[in-house]
Design a protein with these regions (language model features):
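Short, structured motif recognition centered on aromatic/hydrophobic residues
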Residues: 5, 26, 112-114, 157-160
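Short amphipathic alpha-helical segments
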Residues: 14-37, 121-145
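Tryptophan-centric aromatic hotspots in well-structured domains and transmembrane helices
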Residues: 22, 73, 133, 148, ...
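Short, glycine- and small/hydrophobic-rich beta-strand elements in well-ordered beta-sheets
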Residues: 27-51, 55-56, 137-166
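An amphipathic, aromatic/His-enriched active-site/gating alpha helix that lines ligand/cofactor pockets
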Residues: 32-39, 56-89, 143, 163-184
Length: 184
């Protein structure tokens, strides 16, 4: 399975227009996703920043015809948004811990985040997270976090995490202090 992400910024005062236009193309979009076997497609927003995520089979590529279809949809949007990521190009993967991907999403809760990085901090952020990936030594994480990825484009990081709710536990003060130490 391949994982993909994209990001947009809705122009000031145009959120209703953006959502309305998305609703107009939704039946066509979902048919396209089904035909291309693009699954687990989701979009979230924090204020005007929109983060999208989807999964495909390993041999997935956008054909020229696919790109033209997407461009036609964009035409129906007018200029309600601008791209944060580059269309049809992979966003930079900053971190991954794919763990065990649950086929059933019924007991999954999602954690999604969008954060503006300090200018020029992308490489340091990636290096810190590469240490975590290396420390796992290829070991599969059983949970509760699974299918966790952090992407980068336009000075932002975008996180997607599926959390198995049957494996969650109450966080301790030690957990919180560890988070603070990691983040600062």
């Amino acid at each position: 399975m391949l994982r993909h992400a994209f990001a947009l910024e809705v122009k000031e005062g145009r959120t209703s227009e953006f959502r309305g236009n998305l609703g107009k193309i939704w039946p066509e979009l979902t048919a396209f996703l089904d035909a291309k076997k693009m699954v687990n497609f989701s979009m979230w927003n924090v204020e005007r920043i929109v983060f999208g995520y989807y999964e495909t089979e390993d041999d997935f590529v956008f054909t020229d015809a696919d790109k033209e279809t997407v461009k036609a949809w964009e035409g129906s949007y007018g200029d309600a948004y601008t791209w944060v990521s580059t269309p049809f190009e992979e966003m930079r993967l900053m971190y991954h811990d794919f763990g065990i991907v649950r086929e059933s999403k019924e007991l999954i809760r999602h954690r999604v985040f969008i954060t503006k990085l300090v200018p020029g901090a992308e490489d340091e952020y990636k290096a810190r997270h590469d240490v975590l990936v290396e420390a796992r030594g290829g070991k599969v994480t059983e949970g509760p976090d699974s299918n966790f990825s952090i992407w980068n484009a336009g000075g932002y990081i975008f996180g997607y995490n599926e959390i198995d709710t049957t494996m969650e536990r109450d966080r301790t003060e030690e957990d919180r202090q560890g988070d603070i130490a990691w983040e600062t």
